[in-house]
UniProtKB/Swiss-Prot annotation:
<comment type="function">
    <text>Necessary for the introduction of cis unsaturation into fatty acids. Catalyzes the dehydration of (3R)-3-hydroxydecanoyl-ACP to E-(2)-decenoyl-ACP and then its isomerization to Z-(3)-decenoyl-ACP. Can catalyze the dehydratase reaction for beta-hydroxyacyl-ACPs with saturated chain lengths up to 16:0, being most active on intermediate chain length.</text>
</comment>
<keyword id="KW-0276">Fatty acid metabolism</keyword>
<keyword id="KW-0275">Fatty acid biosynthesis</keyword>
<comment type="subunit">
    <text>Homodimer.</text>
</comment>
<dbReference type="Pfam" id="PF07977">
    <property type="entry name" value="FabA"/>
</dbReference>
<keyword id="KW-0444">Lipid biosynthesis</keyword>
<protein>
    <recommendedName>
        <fullName>3-hydroxydecanoyl-[acyl-carrier-protein] dehydratase</fullName>
        <ecNumber>4.2.1.59</ecNumber>
        <ecNumber>5.3.3.14</ecNumber>
    </recommendedName>
</protein>
<dbReference type="GO" id="GO:0034017">
    <property type="term" value="F:trans-2-decenoyl-acyl-carrier-protein isomerase activity"/>
</dbReference>
<dbReference type="InterPro" id="IPR029069">
    <property type="entry name" value="HotDog_dom_sf"/>
</dbReference>
<dbReference type="InterPro" id="IPR013114">
    <property type="entry name" value="FabA_FabZ"/>
</dbReference>
<dbReference type="GO" id="GO:0019171">
    <property type="term" value="F:(3R)-hydroxyacyl-[acyl-carrier-protein] dehydratase activity"/>
</dbReference>
<keyword id="KW-0443">Lipid metabolism</keyword>
<comment type="pathway">
    <text>Lipid metabolism; fatty acid biosynthesis.</text>
</comment>
<keyword id="KW-0413">Isomerase</keyword>
<keyword id="KW-0456">Lyase</keyword>
<dbReference type="GO" id="GO:0006636">
    <property type="term" value="P:unsaturated fatty acid biosynthetic process"/>
</dbReference>
<keyword id="KW-0963">Cytoplasm</keyword>
Length: 174
């Protein structure tokens, strides 16, 4: 395994490497691998940017009609499950915490508010996730709190406030 190189963007192959546990080291945060990896690239990640100046992530998922979830959700009425977009936002907050150099396995801890106002259909081209970190705790507890937005082909279709993800060096109590 190569030493982790903190960059400002990542391509799909690098995200899959992260999912295989080969980016941040053994026992540390991983992204899911396909099919649960809900992003194709991180186009921008920053420790200081974003709406609150605490960090920002912009990531994308390319939509094609043959994505696995369109066949089963729902037959004859295909739509990407909203929970997959929500999970993508949690995935990105966990990635951010590890990208900053924090140890531990990522676990979603909740969200304050989630609102859906649109849908992702197989005719869409691209989903964009925009995460704005509000607070990053890096003590005995490592946790990120963020607001996130999901857009399809440039139109915002849902948001989540106060997404919470923690990194844990011991997950036995879960």
């Amino acid at each position: 395994m190569q030493a982790f190189e903190q960059k400002s963007s990542y391509e799909r192959a690098e995200l899959i490497t992260c999912g295989q546990g080969n980016m941040f080291g053994p026992g540390n945060a991983q992204l899911p691998v396909p099919n649960m990896l809900m992003l194709d690239r991180i186009s921008h990640i920053s420790q200081t940017g974003g709406e609150f100046g605490k960090g920002e992530i912009i990531a994308e998922l390319d939509i094609t009609p043959d994505l696995w979830f369109f066949d089963c959700h729902f037959p004859g009425d295909p739509v990407m499950p909203g929970c997959l977009g929500l999970d993508a936002m949690w995935q990105l907050v966990g990635f951010f915490l590890a990208w900053k150099g924090n140890a531990g396995r990522g676990r979603a801890l909740g969200a304050g508010e989630v609102k859906f106002t649109g849908q992702i259909l197989p005719t869409a081209s691209k989903v964009t996730y925009h995460i704005n970190l509000k607070r990053v705790i890096e003590r005995k507890l490592v946790m990120g709190i963020a607001d996130g937005r999901v857009a399809v082909d440039g139109k915002e279709i849902y948001f989540a406030k106060d997404l919470r993800v923690g990194l844990f060096t011991n997950t036995d109590s879960f």
